[in-house]
A protein has these predicted regions:
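Active-site beta-strand-loop-beta-strand hairpin of nuclease catalytic cores
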Residues: 89-115
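Surface-exposed interaction regions that form or flank ligand-binding interfaces
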Residues: 1-83, 120-287, 298-309
């Protein structure tokens, strides 16, 4: 049997649907509080964006035809430090640590390595700095290096592993949004080489690996299982904070008939109430009376069903 006769393409040793579970949990939250509904919708949009980005990377990997083991969504803790790794790839010659970014807007990397995003607002444009994903992923890589080096008991081997670590482990930031324009014209080469678009991922892996075959299939699988053994479940509970917010939110104490032209006064502060309509969430489209002193007073009165809107 040839060296890579058994593994013909990517093997997903660990897949993740944690973001999907978080999304479903958020979508199931029900509250009449408009402010909380808006915050929930913001989190839902962020999660959907993240899911779309990771699905794009998964598609590229699954269609790469590259023999490798793929670990998706690893949470590693060591010596008080932690790393949340989007994708870890064990290939025949190198190990790749991928940081998936589904960024909106266009991205510029300047000569200092700063990431600057340009977003269009109406007819104008706004520039804003964002935290460098290269720095973020380098910290993930440094933590893995510390783990790998400290596993070596032989002093000479430990020194060798440390010296050649960055030759064998590669940090890559993958931009998943196909509409994002990347301008890295003035970026230093070492930074530029770590940021690619998703549609170049397969080409990048093949280019870095070249014709090198450094480990066999069994060794690849051992490496993959070792990293899998480091994983610790650490799923973010997006619903917990909303449970507290809903519990502490000012509830509607009464209802108001829909078939009347009279306007109620706020039972809490005495201000005139204003008719509003929930724009999002489980009660989207429902009308209610909200205090005109909002946000200082958050009292609401539900409008009971009737013939008059």
């Amino acid at each position: 049997m040839g060296l890579f006769d058994r593994i013909k393409g990517p093997v997903f040793l660990k897949e993740s649907n944690s973001l999907q579970r978080q999304l479903e949990a958020l979508e199931n939250i029900k509250t009449e509080n408009e402010e909380i509904c808006q915050l929930i919708q913001q989190d839902i949009r962020r999660l959907k964006y993240g899911i779309a980005g990771e699905e794009k990377i998964a598609f590229e990997l699954k269609n790469s035809h590259i023999p490798m083991f793929v670990l998706h969504d690893l949470h590693i803790e060591y010596e008080g430090l932690s790393a949340q790794i989007d994708y870890l790839l064990v290939t025949r010659s190198r190990i790749f640590i991928l940081e998936c970014k589904n960024l909106y807007g266009n991205i510029e990397i300047n000569s200092n390595g700063d990431f600057i995003r340009t977003v269009q607002y109406g007819r104008g444009y706004k520039k804003e700095g964002i935290y460098s994903p290269v720095t973020q992923n380098r910290r993930h890589l440094d933590l893995i290096k510390e783990i790998i080096v400290n596993r070596q008991t032989n002093i000479l081997k430990k020194a060798a592993v440390s010296k050649f670590f960055y030759d064998n482990y590669k940090s890559v930031v993958v931009l998943a949004n196909p509409n994002t324009v990347l301008n890295a014209r003035y970026a230093k080469k070492e930074i530029k080489n770590q940021v690619i678009r998703a549609d170049r991922l397969t080409e990048y892996i093949k280019s870095v690996n070249g014709s090198d075959v450094l480990i066999n299939e069994d060794a690849m699988e051992r490496y993959a299982n070792f990293f899998l053994s480091l994983h610790k479940e650490n799923e973010t509970d997006y619903t917990a904070r909303y449970a507290d917010m809903i519990k502490n939110a000012e509830p509607a104490q009464e209802t108001w008939p829909a078939d009347t032209d009279s306007v109620p006064l706020c039972p809490k502060c005495g201000a005139v109430m204003v008719k509003r309509k929930a724009a999002k969430g489980a009660f989207a489209g429902n009308e209610f009376w909200g205090c005109s002193n909002y946000p200082r007073c958050r009292y609401i009165i539900n409008i009971s069903s009737g013939n008059k809107p």
